[in-house]
Amino acid sequence: MKTIKEKVKESFEMLKTEFGYKNAMQAPKIQKVIVSSGVGSIKDKKKIDLVEDRLSKITGQKPARKGAKISIASFKVRQGDIVGMQITLRGARMYDFLDRLINLALPRTKDFRGISSNGIDGMGNYSFGIKENTIFPECSDEELKDVFGMAVTVVTNVKNPKETKAFLTHLGFPFKKVETKEIKEKPKREKKPKAE
Protein backbone atom coordinates (compact mmCIF):
# COMPACT_ATOMS: atom_id res chain seq x y z
CA MET A 1 0.00 0.00 0.00
CA LYS A 2 1.31 3.45 -0.93
CA THR A 3 1.87 6.03 1.78
CA ILE A 4 0.37 9.54 1.70
CA LYS A 5 3.81 10.99 0.93
CA GLU A 6 4.13 8.77 -2.17
CA LYS A 7 0.62 9.70 -3.30
CA VAL A 8 1.40 13.43 -2.93
CA LYS A 9 4.42 12.97 -5.21
CA GLU A 10 2.20 11.24 -7.80
CA SER A 11 -0.53 13.90 -7.63
CA PHE A 12 0.94 15.99 -10.49
CA GLU A 13 0.77 13.08 -12.95
CA MET A 14 -2.69 11.99 -11.76
CA LEU A 15 -4.35 15.42 -11.83
CA LYS A 16 -2.51 17.33 -14.58
CA THR A 17 -4.93 16.42 -17.40
CA GLU A 18 -8.02 17.16 -15.31
CA PHE A 19 -6.86 20.57 -14.06
CA GLY A 20 -4.35 21.58 -16.76
CA TYR A 21 -1.14 21.71 -14.72
CA LYS A 22 1.79 22.67 -16.92
CA ASN A 23 4.69 22.04 -14.51
CA ALA A 24 5.32 20.15 -11.28
CA MET A 25 5.35 23.35 -9.17
CA GLN A 26 1.58 23.66 -9.76
CA ALA A 27 0.94 20.24 -8.22
CA PRO A 28 -1.12 20.28 -5.01
CA LYS A 29 0.69 19.70 -1.71
CA ILE A 30 -0.26 19.42 1.94
CA GLN A 31 1.30 22.29 3.88
CA LYS A 32 0.29 21.35 7.44
CA VAL A 33 -2.26 19.50 9.56
CA ILE A 34 -3.76 21.13 12.66
CA VAL A 35 -5.28 18.93 15.39
CA SER A 36 -7.19 20.68 18.18
CA SER A 37 -9.43 19.71 21.07
CA GLY A 38 -11.29 21.39 23.91
CA VAL A 39 -10.55 20.25 27.46
CA GLY A 40 -14.11 20.31 28.77
CA SER A 41 -13.92 21.21 32.47
CA ILE A 42 -11.33 23.98 32.89
CA LYS A 43 -11.12 23.51 36.67
CA ASP A 44 -10.25 19.81 36.40
CA LYS A 45 -6.44 19.68 36.21
CA LYS A 46 -6.50 15.90 35.65
CA LYS A 47 -8.72 16.29 32.56
CA ILE A 48 -6.36 18.92 31.07
CA ASP A 49 -3.35 16.64 31.64
CA LEU A 50 -5.28 13.65 30.25
CA VAL A 51 -6.21 15.44 27.00
CA GLU A 52 -2.63 16.69 26.63
CA ASP A 53 -1.20 13.19 27.20
CA ARG A 54 -3.54 11.46 24.74
CA LEU A 55 -3.11 14.07 22.00
CA SER A 56 0.66 13.73 22.30
CA LYS A 57 0.31 9.92 22.00
CA ILE A 58 -1.91 10.24 18.91
CA THR A 59 0.18 12.84 17.07
CA GLY A 60 3.68 12.16 18.40
CA GLN A 61 4.11 15.81 19.36
CA LYS A 62 3.38 17.79 22.54
CA PRO A 63 0.30 20.03 22.16
CA ALA A 64 0.30 23.76 22.87
CA ARG A 65 -2.12 24.82 25.61
CA LYS A 66 -4.57 27.48 24.47
CA GLY A 67 -5.93 29.99 26.97
CA ALA A 68 -9.22 31.90 26.90
CA LYS A 69 -8.86 35.25 25.11
CA ILE A 70 -11.54 36.99 27.17
CA SER A 71 -13.21 36.47 30.54
CA ILE A 72 -16.81 35.17 30.49
CA ALA A 73 -18.49 35.40 33.89
CA SER A 74 -21.48 33.17 33.03
CA PHE A 75 -19.12 30.28 32.15
CA LYS A 76 -16.78 31.10 35.07
CA VAL A 77 -13.90 31.45 32.61
CA ARG A 78 -11.14 33.96 33.23
CA GLN A 79 -8.80 35.32 30.63
CA GLY A 80 -5.82 32.96 30.31
CA ASP A 81 -7.58 29.82 31.65
CA ILE A 82 -6.65 26.71 29.63
CA VAL A 83 -9.65 25.87 27.40
CA GLY A 84 -8.07 23.74 24.67
CA MET A 85 -5.04 22.10 23.06
CA GLN A 86 -3.65 22.54 19.57
CA ILE A 87 -0.94 20.79 17.57
CA THR A 88 0.44 21.83 14.18
CA LEU A 89 2.04 18.94 12.30
CA ARG A 90 4.44 19.35 9.39
CA GLY A 91 6.84 17.06 7.52
CA ALA A 92 7.25 13.39 8.48
CA ARG A 93 4.96 13.57 11.55
CA MET A 94 2.19 15.07 9.40
CA TYR A 95 2.41 12.23 6.84
CA ASP A 96 2.56 9.57 9.59
CA PHE A 97 -0.52 11.03 11.29
CA LEU A 98 -2.50 11.14 8.02
CA ASP A 99 -1.51 7.55 7.17
CA ARG A 100 -2.74 6.32 10.56
CA LEU A 101 -5.88 8.46 10.39
CA ILE A 102 -6.98 7.27 6.93
CA ASN A 103 -5.87 3.62 7.08
CA LEU A 104 -6.38 2.71 10.76
CA ALA A 105 -8.45 5.20 12.74
CA LEU A 106 -11.35 6.21 10.47
CA PRO A 107 -12.25 2.61 9.47
CA ARG A 108 -12.50 1.80 13.22
CA THR A 109 -15.28 4.37 13.65
CA LYS A 110 -18.63 2.79 14.50
CA ASP A 111 -20.99 2.65 11.47
CA PHE A 112 -18.43 4.42 9.30
CA ARG A 113 -19.74 5.40 5.87
CA GLY A 114 -17.21 8.06 4.95
CA ILE A 115 -16.44 11.63 5.95
CA SER A 116 -18.38 14.61 4.66
CA SER A 117 -16.79 16.84 2.03
CA ASN A 118 -18.73 19.88 3.31
CA GLY A 119 -15.68 20.98 5.32
CA ILE A 120 -13.76 22.05 2.20
CA ASP A 121 -13.50 25.84 1.97
CA GLY A 122 -12.48 28.11 -0.92
CA MET A 123 -8.90 28.47 0.35
CA GLY A 124 -7.84 24.83 0.03
CA ASN A 125 -8.47 23.85 3.65
CA TYR A 126 -10.45 20.79 4.73
CA SER A 127 -11.79 20.59 8.30
CA PHE A 128 -13.67 17.72 9.91
CA GLY A 129 -14.43 16.46 13.39
CA ILE A 130 -13.70 13.18 15.13
CA LYS A 131 -16.18 12.33 17.89
CA GLU A 132 -14.04 9.87 19.84
CA ASN A 133 -10.30 9.78 20.39
CA THR A 134 -10.53 6.02 20.99
CA ILE A 135 -10.55 5.27 17.25
CA PHE A 136 -6.78 5.73 17.30
CA PRO A 137 -4.79 2.59 18.20
CA GLU A 138 -2.60 4.64 20.58
CA CYS A 139 -5.53 5.04 23.00
CA SER A 140 -5.86 1.67 24.74
CA ASP A 141 -9.08 0.10 26.02
CA GLU A 142 -8.15 1.01 29.61
CA GLU A 143 -8.71 4.67 28.77
CA LEU A 144 -12.33 4.41 27.57
CA LYS A 145 -13.89 6.32 30.48
CA ASP A 146 -12.62 9.76 29.43
CA VAL A 147 -13.45 10.10 25.73
CA PHE A 148 -13.10 13.44 23.96
CA GLY A 149 -13.47 14.68 20.40
CA MET A 150 -11.10 16.62 18.21
CA ALA A 151 -11.03 18.76 15.09
CA VAL A 152 -8.62 18.09 12.22
CA THR A 153 -7.76 20.72 9.58
CA VAL A 154 -5.73 19.77 6.51
CA VAL A 155 -4.18 22.88 4.88
CA THR A 156 -3.20 22.56 1.20
CA ASN A 157 -1.82 24.99 -1.38
CA VAL A 158 -4.88 24.54 -3.62
CA LYS A 159 -7.25 27.51 -3.95
CA ASN A 160 -10.26 25.78 -5.50
CA PRO A 161 -12.78 23.50 -3.68
CA LYS A 162 -13.24 21.12 -6.65
CA GLU A 163 -9.47 20.71 -7.04
CA THR A 164 -9.05 20.25 -3.27
CA LYS A 165 -11.62 17.44 -3.21
CA ALA A 166 -10.00 15.70 -6.21
CA PHE A 167 -6.57 15.95 -4.54
CA LEU A 168 -7.76 14.61 -1.17
CA THR A 169 -9.71 11.81 -2.89
CA HIS A 170 -6.51 10.84 -4.73
CA LEU A 171 -4.72 10.71 -1.35
CA GLY A 172 -7.33 8.25 -0.07
CA PHE A 173 -9.62 10.40 2.08
CA PRO A 174 -12.83 8.31 2.34
CA PHE A 175 -15.49 10.86 1.37
CA LYS A 176 -19.16 9.88 1.56
CA LYS A 177 -20.59 8.85 -1.77
CA VAL A 178 -23.52 11.12 -2.54
CA GLU A 179 -26.35 9.20 -4.11
CA THR A 180 -28.20 11.28 -6.65
CA LYS A 181 -31.84 10.28 -6.90
CA GLU A 182 -33.73 10.94 -10.05
CA ILE A 183 -36.48 13.46 -9.50
CA LYS A 184 -39.59 12.54 -11.40
CA GLU A 185 -41.51 15.44 -12.79
CA LYS A 186 -45.18 15.57 -11.95
CA PRO A 187 -47.40 15.49 -15.00
CA LYS A 188 -48.86 18.92 -15.69
CA ARG A 189 -52.61 19.25 -15.48
CA GLU A 190 -54.45 20.85 -18.27
CA LYS A 191 -56.39 23.88 -17.16
CA LYS A 192 -60.11 23.67 -17.76
CA PRO A 193 -61.67 26.71 -19.30
CA LYS A 194 -63.87 28.62 -16.86
CA ALA A 195 -67.58 28.34 -17.42
CA GLU A 196 -69.25 31.64 -18.17
What is the meaning of each model-derived region?
Residues 1-196:
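Ribosome-associated RNA-binding proteins
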